[in-house]
Amino acid sequence: MASLNMIVAVNKTGGIGFENQIPWHEPEDLKHFKAVTMNSVLIMGRKTFASLPKVLPGRLHVVVSKTVPPTQNTDQVVYVSTYQIAVRTASLLVDKPEYSQIFVIGGKSAYENLAAYVDKLYLTRVQLNTQQDTELDLSLFKSWKLVSEVPTITENKTKLIFQIWINPNPISEEPTC
C-alpha cells in the first residue's frame, strides 16, 4: 500500500463543516490546501466531492459512493464503493508520473475510517468559532507526533496554524472498510 496523507482544517472546537460546506472563508487556507495537494490523488466521500465548486485541476479524485455507478468515471474522477477500493485504486494511480502523493480530504467518515492507515496529517487550526454541524474527533490523533507548526494571520485577521503530524504506528495493510 502506498503512503497515505490526510489534510483537514478545523475550527476551535473541531468543527469541519456546516451544511456540507466549510464553515469559514479564508483564502490563505485554500491556497495552502492547493499547494499541499497539487499533483496528488485525492480520496473523498461523495458529499465532499459534491461540495467542491468544480473538479480540482492538477489532481485526480477518487470518490467513495455506494450510489454513483462507475459508469460516471472521467479522466479526473473515479468512483468506488468502499474505502478499501479507494486506497487500492489511489495506490495504483499514484505510480503515474503526474501524481506524487495520496491525500484523504474528507469528509468525516473518510477521516474516521482511514486515520489509522495515514502516515502524515496536515492539520490547519482555524482560530474561529463558527457554526458547525460536523466535527472531527481530534483524539483520533492523540498518539501522533507534531513535527511542524507555522502560525499566520490572514488578511481577515484570522489566526491559522498550519501543523504537520506524523503517525508513529500506521497500519500498513489495506483498510477493510
From Swiss-Prot:
<dbReference type="InterPro" id="IPR012259">
    <property type="entry name" value="DHFR"/>
</dbReference>
<keyword id="KW-0817">Trimethoprim resistance</keyword>
<comment type="function">
    <text>Key enzyme in folate metabolism. Catalyzes an essential reaction for de novo glycine and purine synthesis, and for DNA precursor synthesis.</text>
</comment>
<comment type="similarity">
    <text>Belongs to the dihydrofolate reductase family.</text>
</comment>
<dbReference type="GO" id="GO:0006730">
    <property type="term" value="P:one-carbon metabolic process"/>
</dbReference>
<comment type="subunit">
    <text>Homodimer.</text>
</comment>
<dbReference type="GO" id="GO:0004146">
    <property type="term" value="F:dihydrofolate reductase activity"/>
</dbReference>
<dbReference type="GO" id="GO:0031427">
    <property type="term" value="P:response to methotrexate"/>
</dbReference>
<keyword id="KW-0046">Antibiotic resistance</keyword>
<dbReference type="InterPro" id="IPR017925">
    <property type="entry name" value="DHFR_CS"/>
</dbReference>
<dbReference type="InterPro" id="IPR024072">
    <property type="entry name" value="DHFR-like_dom_sf"/>
</dbReference>
<feature type="domain" description="DHFR">
    <location>
        <begin position="3"/>
        <end position="167"/>
    </location>
</feature>
<dbReference type="GO" id="GO:0050661">
    <property type="term" value="F:NADP binding"/>
</dbReference>
<dbReference type="GO" id="GO:0046654">
    <property type="term" value="P:tetrahydrofolate biosynthetic process"/>
</dbReference>
<keyword id="KW-0554">One-carbon metabolism</keyword>
<keyword id="KW-0487">Methotrexate resistance</keyword>
<dbReference type="GO" id="GO:0046655">
    <property type="term" value="P:folic acid metabolic process"/>
</dbReference>
<protein>
    <recommendedName>
        <fullName>Dihydrofolate reductase type 9</fullName>
        <ecNumber>1.5.1.3</ecNumber>
    </recommendedName>
</protein>
<keyword id="KW-0521">NADP</keyword>
<dbReference type="GO" id="GO:0046452">
    <property type="term" value="P:dihydrofolate metabolic process"/>
</dbReference>
<dbReference type="Pfam" id="PF00186">
    <property type="entry name" value="DHFR_1"/>
</dbReference>
<keyword id="KW-0614">Plasmid</keyword>
<dbReference type="InterPro" id="IPR001796">
    <property type="entry name" value="DHFR_dom"/>
</dbReference>
<comment type="pathway">
    <text>Cofactor biosynthesis; tetrahydrofolate biosynthesis; 5,6,7,8-tetrahydrofolate from 7,8-dihydrofolate: step 1/1.</text>
</comment>
<dbReference type="GO" id="GO:0046677">
    <property type="term" value="P:response to antibiotic"/>
</dbReference>
<keyword id="KW-0560">Oxidoreductase</keyword>
